[in-house]
């Protein structure tokens, strides 16, 4: 907590601490204050962290690649995939992928094994869906983060919205469903459009959805039959329900074909 650190500095000043010790603490406080954001949900997170703090992806990718290489040596067949989150600009993904591929190549040479790790994009912003055809030139797969996509499509902060007005909106029939539980038609259309754009650019891509919508039967039906995604992922306790809903969606699609 930066304010606790501020109090600690004041106490040390009063106690006559050395300037050298105080300088270290003041520098730390400035660093922390410099990272505080007014709206962190739309601030420095996701791929933006990798762009600003360029060492971050180096460490993360090296850890994944090294673990995969060592498992291969042990006779295991690991299948890691690396997903770049919160992309909204194609160049964000392109530059980050260049770093990822360089690190994978380095680890492959160091460990003496061939590594084939797909690199995809997490689409969770409306702009990313609009330029999905551009991003698809540089991605092996798309996964839709529909929680954040819902937040940024509606302009809702989920925690605030669910606590303060979504129940009232549902009571007044402004909203039929909680859009964080059942995917909204406009959000579903963004997913459908992005899948269509991505598949037109790269027919070999696979498309998935992660988040709570991946465990909601009504959402699953739309995601498979309208948006045409390949899979959904969800929390473990929702897996049986999700598998049943996915099977029902497939049967409905085959029956109506």
Locate the predicted segments by residue.
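Conserved alpha/beta-domain cores
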Residues: 1-257
């Amino acid at each position: 907590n930066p304010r606790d650190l501020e109090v600690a500095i004041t106490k040390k000043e009063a106690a006559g601490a050395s300037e050298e010790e105080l300088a270290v603490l003041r520098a730390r406080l400035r660093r922390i204050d410099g990272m505080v954001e007014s709206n962190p949900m739309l601030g420095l997170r996701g791929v933006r962290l990798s762009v600003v703090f360029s060492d971050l992806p180096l460490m993360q990718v090296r850890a994944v690649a090294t673990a995969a290489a060592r498992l291969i040596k042990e006779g295991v067949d690991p299948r890691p995939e690396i997903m770049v989150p919160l992309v909204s600009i194609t160049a964000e993904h392109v530059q980050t992928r260049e770093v990822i591929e360089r690190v994978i190549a380095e680890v492959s040479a160091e460990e003496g094994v061939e590594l084939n790790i797909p690199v995809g994009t997490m689409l969770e912003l409306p702009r990313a869906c609009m330029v999905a055809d551009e991003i698809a030139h540089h991605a092996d797969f798309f996964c839709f983060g529909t929680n954040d996509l819902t937040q940024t499509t509606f302009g809702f902060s989920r925690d605030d919205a669910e606590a303060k007005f979504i129940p009232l909106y549902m009571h007044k029939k402004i909203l039929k469903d909680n859009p964080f539980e059942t995917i909204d038609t406009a959000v579903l259309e963004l997913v459908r459009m992005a899948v269509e754009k991505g598949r037109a650019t790269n027919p070999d891509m696979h498309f998935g959805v992660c988040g709570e919508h991946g465990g909601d039967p009504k959402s699953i039906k739309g995601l498979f039959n309208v948006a045409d995604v390949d899979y959904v992922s969800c929390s473990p306790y929702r897996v049986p329900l999700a598998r049943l809903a996915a099977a029902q969606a497939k049967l409905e699609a085959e029956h109506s074909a």
